[in-house]
């Protein structure tokens, strides 16, 4: 069960520290408590209320069997997001956002399918029938795909929502989500426009301690939602469709992988 949100815990994590006042976005005014030494201080009571609101929505999404894609490519957030999202069994992008990740999902699916094909080759023994050089090349290709696509190898369809750390840094991802009417949950600092996302969590999005605290709270809610999952039907159907796709032209897929791997640069 997710922990109760305590304002003192948010305070200890430094969630309240905003940016310098001259960098503020006036649309964040409702979430700002005061100014101190030229820095805006976020109202943590409002932050706590917004986390509660976001968590209720995230729980429902998780309980329905749909995916929430976590996006954070800034240095201080990457490792935290990878760890927390993986613990909640949710996909994440922590390297450069692949352009068209959402709006051109068919192409992304092809890359994801390559990852799945390589994983299957390793599982069924096909990988070991390759020459040593080919195995090295295929491993290199798999590593490249993993780096570019994060943990989305099991994401067979568009996510139901995005969770973003720093909406300025991830503006391309947010624009793609907007085009497809995919709701965005986000940590929003005092220098950003909260109108760009559906679920605003006013918070310090620069300090790792603050990011860790918020991510812990939201992923606990997601894990709760998964535990109370109400319907597996949709997810099961998707799994069957993907499984059916994978057995189609298996040998051709494997040959294509080996050929592409041979062209991959070190």
From Swiss-Prot:
GO terms for molecular function: structural constituent of ribosome. Gene3D superfamilies: Glucose-6-phosphate isomerase like protein, domain 1, Helix hairpin bin. The keyword Acyltransferase does not apply. One of its GO terms (biological process) is translation. CDD domains: RPS2. InterPro entries: Ribosomal_uS2, Ribosomal_uS2_bac/mit/plastid, Ribosomal_uS2_CS, Ribosomal_uS2_flav_dom_sf. Keywords: Ribonucleoprotein, Ribosomal protein. Residues 229-254 are annotated as: Disordered. GO terms for cellular component: cytosolic small ribosomal subunit. It comes from the Bacteria. Residues 237-247 have a biased composition (Acidic residues). Coiled coil: none annotated. Belongs to the universal ribosomal protein uS2 family. This is Small ribosomal subunit protein uS2. It comes from Flavobacterium psychrophilum (strain ATCC 49511 / DSM 21280 / CIP 103535 / JIP02/86). The lineage of its organism: Bacteria, Pseudomonadati, Bacteroidota, Flavobacteriia, Flavobacteriales. The gene is rpsB.
């Amino acid at each position: 069960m997710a922990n109760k949100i305590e304002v003192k815990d948010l305070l200890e994590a430094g969630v309240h520290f905003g940016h310098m006042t001259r960098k503020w976005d006036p649309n964040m005014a409702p979430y700002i408590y005061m100014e101190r030494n030229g820095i805006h201080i976020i109202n943590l009571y409002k932050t706590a209320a917004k986390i509660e609101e976001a968590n209720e929505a995230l729980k429902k999404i998780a309980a329905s069997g749909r995916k929430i894609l976590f996006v954070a490519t800034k240095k201080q957030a990457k490792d935290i997001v990878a760890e927390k999202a993986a613990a909640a069994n949710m996909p994440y992008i922590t390297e450069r956002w692949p352009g068209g990740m959402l709006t051109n999902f068919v192409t992304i699916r092809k890359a994801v399918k390559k990852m799945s094909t390589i994983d299957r080759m390793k599982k069924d023994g096909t990988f070991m029938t390759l020459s040593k050089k080919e195995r090295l090349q295929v491993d290199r290709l798999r590593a490249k795909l993993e780096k570019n696509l994060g943990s989305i190898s099991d994401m067979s369809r568009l996510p139901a929502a995005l969770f973003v750390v720093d909406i300025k840094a991830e503006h391309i991802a947010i624009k793609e989500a907007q085009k497809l009417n995919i709701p965005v949950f986000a940590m929003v600092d005092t220098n950003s426009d909260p109108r760009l996302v559906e679920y605003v969590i006013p918070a310090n999005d620069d300090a790792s301690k603050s990011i860790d605290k918020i991510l812990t709270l939201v992923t606990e809610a997601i894990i709760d939602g998964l535990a109370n999952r109400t319907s597996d039907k949709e997810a099961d159907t998707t799994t069957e469709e993907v499984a059916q796709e994978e057995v189609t032209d298996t040998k051709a897929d494997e040959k294509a992988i080996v050929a592409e791997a041979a062209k991959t640069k070190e």
